[in-house]
């Protein structure tokens, strides 16, 4: 595609929206250029020699693939001019000449390009209309036609009821001439305001149809029997999930000093495509995967394993079962591309929740009239019998087979089979849920009236509220008649288009102090129910609240976790269970029952000193377990005690007690103060992530996430 923008007197309001969108496609064949009309200087960019009538025209950019750097350069160059001289049609002739030169082959024949010229003008100034017919004939050239789009600033728009007041006679004359010229070129004539409004509507990505399967639809085995049905078909995607752009990891680029040689860039060639110099201070990073195993010679340490030393295996229970490469060939299911019918099912008997995948179209092979006739007959037979076909599909050699459902689809201009993937028996999840309208007792008695079951009054109120919130007739068509509200073709994915919008905005506005633009109205239009519909259904909603006995729940009081026992929910009886049972305020930590006794000690009192005393006793017992452990026999109990101690102190919002303890324990382990070399215990603590409690885990902690992460490092 080759496109040129003619921008007059700085009227480039749509530039910041349309160009970044085109750049985001990354297509090398999408060539663009920008030509300024009525500029202060004249620069034809070498397209033609400067001649009379071509003054005050400037080629800001030659016809090429636009990248981010080109947009930013163009932003700096485009400024309002101080002159009214310059002929718009001369600029158009320059644009046509530029497109011709860039889209011709070596033999002088036009190449296969979509050619388009977009003109943005206010219609002021003089226009030489002597050569209109010749220019229009060139634009309509059947061998290389050009799509012409003219957008006028403050042009009269009868459709929207706009008419410029106090319009000069020169502009009125130019509007009439330009409109007739554009219509003669079979182009599009509109206003800039209308174009900007249209740009707010997300542009859907046009994808080239790529077949996922080319083969034969068969009924029976054509390799062994003659009485078989064989139709040549092709399979194309019908629906496919549109995913938003994904973020990549980047590192801040190091600034090299003057005169120093820059080393090789870490940025990938994909990131640097077409850019001689990066436009940001970020550099793409490379990922490297390392495989490690326990080092038997150095307990607690790891050693790297090369890729050629790895073997494949499957987990069987807790054991890895090795499968050699020769055996892997036996495990693989040998399949060949095929689409064979295995059965039929009545349409009313098919459960709509069964499809697993996106939908695809099955159409006859291109140019094969016999296949078209055969498939059309098969589609009509299924449609008239009100049946669906079930088939076994293998799209490529050695790929696992899938079961698909073939549904006939007949429209006015086309016919096709729509296929969706069906689950195997192993794919099904048959959960049983209790009924919503009755309860079953253990004895088998059916109860229809219960506090957890809806009453007739509630059911009736809900039914009326649903009817009042009906969206199927809330909208209005062009004639003002009731129509569906929020049609699928009018709804767009907010996440896909919003992320794309922000990427384009930040690319052209790199200043981080600038606020982000709000999302388009069309993306938020259907985020909430229509206000008019909510107002109209107020009475039904109030009746539903009354029937359901809806009451406001008091807000939850934020406290200091378990510490303040006085604020806990008291039992209905009002009795103090701890006082009745005679539980003491201080509980001694029992080494033989370490975890339960520690929890009891914390629950016995709210006093901070008591909590510190319990934590100190727990830390002593943990050190004792590690010190007296033969090998790693006692490490399991110690790790469990560490986990409980960390969780309980975090819940009590006393992370500083834990952080002080774990710092000391790390030092003792690495310095060998717990009866010898206990570094392997530290590696187990590190592997279980029993380190410092940071602010992310407890808002009262004074440890940052960076400090908590660095704590696991060993100097």
From Swiss-Prot:
Its EC number is 3.6.4.12. It is found in: Nucleus; Chromosome, Telomere. Residues 254-282 are annotated as: Disordered. It comes from the Eukaryota. InterPro entries: Ku70/Ku80_beta-barrel_dom, Ku80, Ku_C_sf, Ku_PK_bind, SPOC-like_C_dom_sf, VWF_A, vWFA_dom_sf. The keyword Cell inner membrane does not apply. Keywords: ATP-binding, Chromosome, DNA damage, DNA recombination, DNA repair, DNA-binding, Helicase, Hydrolase, Nucleotide-binding, Nucleus, Telomere. Its main location: nucleus. It holds the Pfam family Ku. One of its GO terms (molecular function) is ATP binding. GO terms for cellular component: chromosome, telomeric region; Ku70:Ku80 complex. Residues 217-468 form the Ku domain. One of its GO terms (biological process) is double-strand break repair via nonhomologous end joining. It catalyses: ATP + H2O = ADP + phosphate + H(+). Heterodimer of Ku70 and Ku80. Single-stranded DNA-dependent ATP-dependent helicase. Involved in non-homologous end joining (NHEJ) DNA double strand break repair. DNA-binding is sequence-independent but has a high affinity to nicks in double-stranded DNA and to the ends of duplex DNA. Binds to naturally occurring chromosomal ends, and therefore provides chromosomal end protection. Required also for telomere recombination to repair telomeric ends in the absence of telomerase. KU70, of the KU70/KU80 heterodimer, binds to the stem loop of TLC1, the RNA component of telomerase. Involved in telomere maintenance. Belongs to the ku80 family. PANTHER family: KU AUTOANTIGEN DNA HELICASE, X-RAY REPAIR CROSS-COMPLEMENTING PROTEIN 5. This is ATP-dependent DNA helicase II subunit 2. It comes from Phaeosphaeria nodorum (strain SN15 / ATCC MYA-4574 / FGSC 10173) (Glume blotch fungus).
């Amino acid at each position: 595609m080759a496109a040129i923008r003619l921008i007059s007197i700085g009227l480039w309001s749509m530039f910041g929206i349309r160009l970044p969108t085109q750049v985001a496609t990354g297509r090398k064949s999408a060539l663009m250029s920008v030509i300024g009309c009525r500029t202060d200087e004249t620069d034809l960019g070498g397209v033609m020699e400067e001649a009379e009538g071509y003054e005050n025209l400037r080629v800001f950019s030659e016809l090429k693939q636009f990248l981010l750097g080109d947009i930013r350069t163009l932003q700096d160059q485009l400024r309002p001019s101080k002159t009214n001289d310059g002929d718009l049609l001369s600029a158009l002739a320059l644009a046509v000449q530029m497109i011709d030169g860039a889209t011709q082959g070596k033999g002088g024949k036009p190449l296969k390009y979509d050619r388009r010229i977009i003109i943005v003008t206010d219609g002021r100034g003089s226009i030489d209309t002597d050569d209109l017919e010749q220019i229009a004939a060139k634009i309509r050239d059947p061998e290389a036609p050009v799509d012409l789009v003219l957008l006028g600033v403050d042009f009269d728009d009868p459709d929207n009821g706009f008419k410029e007041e106090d319009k000069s006679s020169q502009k009125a004359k130019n509007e009439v001439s330009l409109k007739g010229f554009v219509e003669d070129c079979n182009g599009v004539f509109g206003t800039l305001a209308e174009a900007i409004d249209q740009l707010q509507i997300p542009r859907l990505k046009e994808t080239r149809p790529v077949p996922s399967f080319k083969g034969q639809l068969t009924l029976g085995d054509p390799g062994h029997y003659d009485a078989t049905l064989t139709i040549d078909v092709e399979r194309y995607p019908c629906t496919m999930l549109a995913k938003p752009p994904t973020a990549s990891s980047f590192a801040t680029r190091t600034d090299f000093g003057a005169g120093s040689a820059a080393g090789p860039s870490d940025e990938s060639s994909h990131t640097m495509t077409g850019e001689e110099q990066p436009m940001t201070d970020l550099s793409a990073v490379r990922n490297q995967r390392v495989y490690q195993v326990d080092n038997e010679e150095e307990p607690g340490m790891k050693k790297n394993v090369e890729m050629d030393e790895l073997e494949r295996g499957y987990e069987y229970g807790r054991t890895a079962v090795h499968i050699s490469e020769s055996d892997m060939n036996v495990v693989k299911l040998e399949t060949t591309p095929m689409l064979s019918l295995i059965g039929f099912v009545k349409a009313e008997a098919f459960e709509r929740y069964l499809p697993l995948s996106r939908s695809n179209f099955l159409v006859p092979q291109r140019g094969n009239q016999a296949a078209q006739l055969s498939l059309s007959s098969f589609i009509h037979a299924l449609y008239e019998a009100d049946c669906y076909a079930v088939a076994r599909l293998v799209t490529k050699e050695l790929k696992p087979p899938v079961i698909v459902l073939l549904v006939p689809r007949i429209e006015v201009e086309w016919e096709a089979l729509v296929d969706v993937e069906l689950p195997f028996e192993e794919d099904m999840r048959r959960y049983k849920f209790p009924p919503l309208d009755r309860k079953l007792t253990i004895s088998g008695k059916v109860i229809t009236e219960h506090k957890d079951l809806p009453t007739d009054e509630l059911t009736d109120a809900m039914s009326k509220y649903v009817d009042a919130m009906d969206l199927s007739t809330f909208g209005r068509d062009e004639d003002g008649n009731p129509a569906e509200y929020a049609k699928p073709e009018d709804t767009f994915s907010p996440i896909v288009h919003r992320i794309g919008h922000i990427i384009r905005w930040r690319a052209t506005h790199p200043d981080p102090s600038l606020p982000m633009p709000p999302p388009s109205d069309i993306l938020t239009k259907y985020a909430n129910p229509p206000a008019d519909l909510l107002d109209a259904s107020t009475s039904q909603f109030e009746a539903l609240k009354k029937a359901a006995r809806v009451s406001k729940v008091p807000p939850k009081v934020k406290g200091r976790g378990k510490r303040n026992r006085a604020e806990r929910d008291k039992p209905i009886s009002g009795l103090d269970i701890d006082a009745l049972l005679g539980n003491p305020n201080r509980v001694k930590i029992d080494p033989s029952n370490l975890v339960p006794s520690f929890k009891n000690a914390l629950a016995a009192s709210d006093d901070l000193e008591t909590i510190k005393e319990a934590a100190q006793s727990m830390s002593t017992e943990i050190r004792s377990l590690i010190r007296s452990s033969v090998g790693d026999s006692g490490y399991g109990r110690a790790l469990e005690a560490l986990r409980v101690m960390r969780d309980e102190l975090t819940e009590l919002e006393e992370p500083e007690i834990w952080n002080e303890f774990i710092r000391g324990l790390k030092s003792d382990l690495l310095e060998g103060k717990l009866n010898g070399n206990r570094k392997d215990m530290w590696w187990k603590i590190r592997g279980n992530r029993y380190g410092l409690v940071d602010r992310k885990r407890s808002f009262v902690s004074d440890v940052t996430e960076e400090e908590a992460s660095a704590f696991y490092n060993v100097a």
